[in-house]
Amino acid sequence: MEFVKDLKTPEDYINNELKYGAHNYDPIPVVLKRAKGVFVYDVNDKRYYDFLSAYSSVNQGHCHPNILNAMINQAKNLTICSRAFFSVPLGICERYLTNLLGYDKVLMMNTGAEANETAYKLCRKWGYEVKKIPENMAKIVVCKNNFSGRTLGCISASTTKKCTSNFGPFAPQFSKVPYDDLEALEEELKDPNVCAFIVEPIQGEAGVIVPSDNYLQGVYDICKKYNVLFVADEVQTGLGRTGKLLCVHHYNVKPDVILLGKALSGGHYPISAVLANDDIMLVIKPGEHGSTYGGNPLAASICVEALNVLINEKLCENAEKLGGPFLENLKRELKDSKIVRDVRGKGLLCAIEFKNELVNVLDICLKLKENGLITRDVHDKTIRLTPPLCITKEQLDECTEIIVKTVKFFDERF
């Protein structure tokens, strides 16, 4: 393109983005131009292991040929027609998703934030029409340190100052309880105006916080006791990331509502979904909720193939098989580190928490980049380790060496 012929070096691309784009992100200084499988490549063609996976969007690996072909083939025929009409791909996608996960209905949207916003509306409406909560009194309970997006509804449910500072006033009737605290949850759910409890099975953005083994079963039981909808936000934890198709499957519970996003397209297109049974989903009537792009034919075709890849290539099983040894190897190699506070995770949703009073975690990310692996810090103290689920044992062993080598580089300062 003639108008960008001045862009040649990584610095040129970085400065161009900073000049013309809003400063709502603070990226690691690497300029990526292509990707394949578990690898991304910068403008100088240096290869990196991707250990962020677009926040678990590319569970199937970057640019998977089957998903890409499904996308191209559908784009040649029909990309969008709006929900004013029926389309062939949408019904197929809806049937596949509901049968796969065991729910009556699915409502397709575009982003994880939209899935959460949809859940807020769905649960409130169910609260008024089924639970008979007085008008405008419906309350939704969420966990402290959750992350569901940055729309106004989502930040109304947030306790993260960076998300909420100077963005008020907020949507009312969100109550926050500590994560992994059943006693606090039960106390809150005694309020008859509570319609729903929305929870991440593992808190991702909080730093990969894994709850007690009995937590989600306890959540299920308490929600049933007080006639409150149990909503599992599986946008980040779902679709194989933790070693099961859904993270809640580890705990043998079935929430009333499931929220999905990210890997629903394998990173090729924004797709999200809300799943529930008829007694919940059908409180929403025509015209009461929707999206121009939600459930478009292109998204539906991509979604079906992304799920096919996940299942046919046994990526859930791969995450479960490799995740445990990966975590144990890191714990063993880093147990004597002066700067590591904790190593934790489930499947291939893992993290290392550092003693941020001793080390700048951003510096660790930059050193990892130098050593051929990219990821990002969370809350200035934790780095996320979430490779695509197609990673092999040999590749994961190499990445373990990179991570250990990087941590030991900083350990040598003490």
Curated annotation (Swiss-Prot):
NCBIfam families: Orn_aminotrans. Pathway: Amino-acid biosynthesis; L-proline biosynthesis; L-glutamate 5-semialdehyde from L-ornithine: step 1/1. It holds the Pfam family Aminotran_3. Keywords: Aminotransferase, Cytoplasm, Disulfide bond, Pyridoxal phosphate, Transferase. The modification N6-(pyridoxal phosphate)lysine is found at K262. CDD domains: OAT_like. Its EC number is 2.6.1.13. Transmembrane segments: none annotated. This is Ornithine aminotransferase. It comes from Plasmodium yoelii yoelii. Unlike for mammalian OATs, activity is increased by TRX1-mediated reduction of the disulfide bond between Cys-154 and Cys-163. Binding to TRX1 may also induce conformational changes that facilitate substrate binding. It is found in: Cytoplasm. Its main location: cytoplasm.
